[in-house]
C-alpha cells in the first residue's frame, strides 16, 4: 500500500510504477561513471532487502580469480628472477673479491674483524643512518620534519621501511597510532577524493559539452574525456613531481618516476625515499611531500572509483544485451512454434477438406449407382431379402453359384449385367 501523502500529492498518477533501479536497462541509463566516491548519504537497508539486492560472488568465480592471480604471480616471479638474479650474483661476487683484496692489502686486519665492522655498518643502515663521512654532521632521522613524514607513511599504509621504531615504547605507540590513524586517514582520503572528483567532473563536463556541439558521438566523448582526465592527472601528480624529485634528490628520471608510482600505489619499498639522502633539506620539504602524497592518493582513488563505475556500467550493459538476446531468442522460438502449429493446422484442414470432398463424391456416386440399379436392373430377378416370408422364399428356385459372384442380392445370371452397368457409370 502506498502512503496517503504519495497518493494525494499533485501530479501523481496511480498505476505508474517508479523505475526499477535493479533493472539493467534503467540502471545503465541512470548510472554514469563518476570520478570520486559517492557523495550521496548512505541508506542502510533492512536485512530482507539487503539479502535480495546483494549479489555474492560464487565460489566458482572466486576460484577462477584466485587461479588467475596465482598465475599472474608466477609470471611476475619468473620475470623478476630473470632480471634481478644475475645482478644479485654479480654483486655477491664483487663484494667477496673486494673483501679478499682489502685483507690482502691490509695485513693488520683479519677477516673476522672485517666481518664485525660490516655487520655494524649494516645495522646502522637498517636503523636509517648512512655511515659515510663525518657522522657527527649528519641530520637526524627523528627530527620534527622527519617524524611528521614517518607518521604520514604509517597512516597512509605506505611504510617505506627506511626508518622504523627501535624502542619498545616506540613500537607500542606505533601499533596504537596506526590502528587509530588509518581509519581517520581513510575518511580524509574519501573527502578529498570527492572534492577532487567534483572539480575534475566539472572540467570534463565542459569538455563534453564542447564535443557535443561538434556532433561527436557519446561513446567517443566519454573515451576522450576519460583520456584527458587521466593524462592531466598523470602530468599533475606523476610527471611534475618526478621532475622536482629528480632535481632535489639527484635521481635519474627513471628512479624519480619509479619512486612516484611506488609511493602513490602505497607499495613503498623504501629503496628510494624523498628526504632520505645525506643532504640538507628545507624544514617544510617533507611535510610538503606528505601533502603531495595525500592529494596523489586521492587522485588515484578517484581514478579507481571511475574505473569501478565503468566496469559496473559495462557489466549492466552486458547483462542488458544478454537479456535482449534471450528475449529475441525466446521470441524467435515462439514465432517458429506458432508458425509450425499454424502450418500443421492448415495441413490438417486441407487434408480434412479433401477427405470430406472424397467422401461426398463417394456418396454421390453411391446414390447414382443405386438409381441406375433401380432403372436398368428391374428385368433381372433378385433374390429375396431376409425379410421375405418363408413361403415366398421357398417358391423361388435355388441360387446357383457362378464363379462365386453374388452382387446386391442378384441371381448369378444377372451378375454380368450388373458389372456392365457399373463400368458404364464409371
UniProtKB/Swiss-Prot annotation:
Top-level lineage group: Eukaryota
Q: Where does K(+) 4 bind?
A: 157, 266
Q: Which residues cross the membrane?
A: 62-82, 172-192, 224-244, 288-308
Task: Give the matching InterPro entries.
Answer: 2pore_dom_K_chnl, 2pore_dom_K_chnl_TREK, K_chnl_dom
The PTM Phosphoserine maps to: 348
> Which ranges sit in the Cytoplasmic compartment?
1-61, 193-223, 309-426
Topology class, membrane: Multi-pass membrane protein
Q: Does the keyword Transmembrane apply?
A: yes
Q: Where is it located?
A: Cell projection, Axon; Cell projection, Dendrite; Postsynaptic density membrane; Cell membrane, Sarcolemma
Q: Which residues lie within the membrane without crossing it?
A: 144-170, 253-283
Instruction: From the UniProt entry, list the residue stretches annotated as the region Selectivity filter 1.
Output: 157-162
- UniProt binding sites for K(+) 3: 159-160, 268-269
Q: For this protein, what is any one GO molecular function term?
A: metal ion binding
Q: Which reaction does it catalyse?
A: K(+)(in) = K(+)(out); L-glutamate(out) = L-glutamate(in); chloride(in) = chloride(out); Rb(+)(in) = Rb(+)(out)
The annotated region (Interaction with AKAP5) lies at: 313-326
Modifications the protein undergoes after translation, according to the UniProt entry: Phosphorylation at Ser-348 controls the reversible conversion from a leak channel to a voltage-dependent channel.
Region (Essential for chloroform and halothane sensitivity) residue ranges read 337-385
Keywords from the named record = Cell membrane, Cell projection, Disulfide bond, Endoplasmic reticulum, Glycoprotein, Ion channel, Ion transport, Membrane, Metal-binding, Phosphoprotein, Postsynaptic cell membrane, Potassium, Potassium channel, Potassium transport, Synapse, Transmembrane, Transmembrane helix, Transport
Positions binding K(+) 1 in this chain are 157-158, 266-267
One GO cellular-component annotation of the UniProt record comes to: apical plasma membrane
What does the entry report regarding how activity is regulated?
A: Activated by various stimuli including intracellular acidic pH, mechanical stretch and polyunsaturated fatty acids such as arachidonic acid. Activated by volatile anesthetics such as chloroform, halothane, and isoflurane.
Q: What does this protein do?
A: K(+) channel that conducts voltage-dependent outward rectifying currents upon membrane depolarization. Voltage sensing is coupled to K(+) electrochemical gradient in an 'ion flux gating' mode where outward but not inward ion flow opens the gate. Converts to voltage-independent 'leak' conductance mode upon stimulation by various stimuli including mechanical membrane stretch, acidic pH, heat and lipids. Reversibly converts between a voltage-insensitive K(+) 'leak' channel and a voltage-dependent outward rectifying K(+) channel in a phosphorylation-dependent manner.
Give the domain note: Each subunit contributes two pore-forming domains 1 and 2 which assemble to form a single pore with M2 and M4 transmembrane helices lining the central cavity and M1 and M3 facing the lipid bilayer. The transmembrane helices are bridged by the selectivity filters 1 and 2 carrying a signature sequence TxTTxGYGD that coordinate the permeant ions. Up to four ions can simultaneously occupy the selectivity filter and at least two elementary charges must translocate across the filter to convert it into the open conformation.
Q: What is this protein called?
A: Potassium channel subfamily K member 2
Amino acid at each position: 500500500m502506498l502512503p496517503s501523502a504519495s497518493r494525494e500529492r499533485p501530479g501523481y498518477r496511480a498505476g505508474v510504477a517508479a523505475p526499477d533501479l535493479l533493472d539493467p536497462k534503467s540502471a545503465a541509463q541512470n548510472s554514469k561513471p563518476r570520478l570520486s566516491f559517492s557523495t550521496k548519504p548512505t541508506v542502510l537497508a533492512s536485512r530482507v532487502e539487503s539479502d535480495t539486492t546483494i549479489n555474492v560472488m560464487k565460489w566458482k568465480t572466486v576460484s577462477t580469480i584466485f587461479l588467475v592471480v596465482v598465475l599472474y604471480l608466477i609470471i611476475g616471479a619468473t620475470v623478476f628472477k630473470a632480471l634481478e638474479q644475475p645482478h644479485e650474483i654479480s654483486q655477491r661476487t664483487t663484494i667477496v673479491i673486494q673483501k679478499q683484496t682489502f685483507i690482502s692489502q691490509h695485513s693488520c686486519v683479519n677477516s673476522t674483524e672485517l666481518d664485525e665492522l660490516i655487520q655494524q655498518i649494516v645495522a646502522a643502515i637498517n636503523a636509517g643512518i648512512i655511515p659515510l663521512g663525518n657522522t657527527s654532521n649528519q641530520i637526524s632521522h627523528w627530527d620534527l620534519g622527519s617524524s611528521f613524514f614517518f607518521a604520514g607513511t604509517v597512516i597512509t599504509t605506505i611504510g617505506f621501511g627506511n626508518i622504523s621504531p627501535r624502542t619498545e615504547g616506540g613500537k607500542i605507540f606505533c601499533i596504537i597510532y596506526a590502528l587509530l590513524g588509518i581509519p581517520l586517514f581513510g575518511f580524509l582520503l574519501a573527502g578529498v577524493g570527492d572534492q577532487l572528483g567534483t572539480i575534475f567532473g566539472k572540467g570534463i563536463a565542459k569538455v563534453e559539452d564542447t564535443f557535443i556541439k561538434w556532433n561527436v558521438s557519446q561513446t567517443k566523448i566519454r573515451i576522450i574525456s576519460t583520456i584527458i582526465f587521466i593524462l592531466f592527472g598523470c602530468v599533475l601528480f606523476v610527471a611534475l613531481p618526478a621532475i622536482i624529485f629528480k632535481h632535489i634528490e639527484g635521481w635519474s628520471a627513471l628512479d624519480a618516476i619509479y619512486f612516484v608510482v611506488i609511493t602513490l600505489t602505497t607499495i613503498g619499498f623504501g629503496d628510494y625515499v624523498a628526504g632520505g639522502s645525506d643532504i640538507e633539506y628545507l624544514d617544510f620539504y617533507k611535510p610538503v611531500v606528505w601533502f603531495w602524497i595525500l592529494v596523489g592518493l586521492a587522485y588515484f582513488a578517484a581514478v579507481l572509483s571511475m574505473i569501478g563505475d565503468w566496469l559496473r556500467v559495462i557489466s549492466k550493459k552486458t547483462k542488458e544485451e544478454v537479456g535482449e538476446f534471450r528475449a529475441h531468442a525466446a521470441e524467435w522460438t515462439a514465432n517458429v512454434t506458432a508458425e509450425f502449429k499454424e502450418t500443421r493446422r492448415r495441413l490438417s484442414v486441407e487434408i480434412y477438406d479433401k477427405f470430406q470432398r472424397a467422401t461426398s463424391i463417394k456418396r454421390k456416386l453411391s446414390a447414382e449407382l443405386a438409381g441406375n440399379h433401380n432403372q436398368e436392373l428391374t428385368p433381372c430377378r433378385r433374390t429375396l431379402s431376409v425379410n421375405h416370408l418363408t413361403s415366398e422364399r421357398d417358391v423361388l428356385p435355388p441360387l446357383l453359384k457362378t464363379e462365386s459372384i453374388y452382387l446386391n442380392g442378384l441371381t448369378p445370371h444377372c451378375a454380368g449385367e450388373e458389372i456392365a452397368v457399373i463400368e458404364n457409370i464409371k
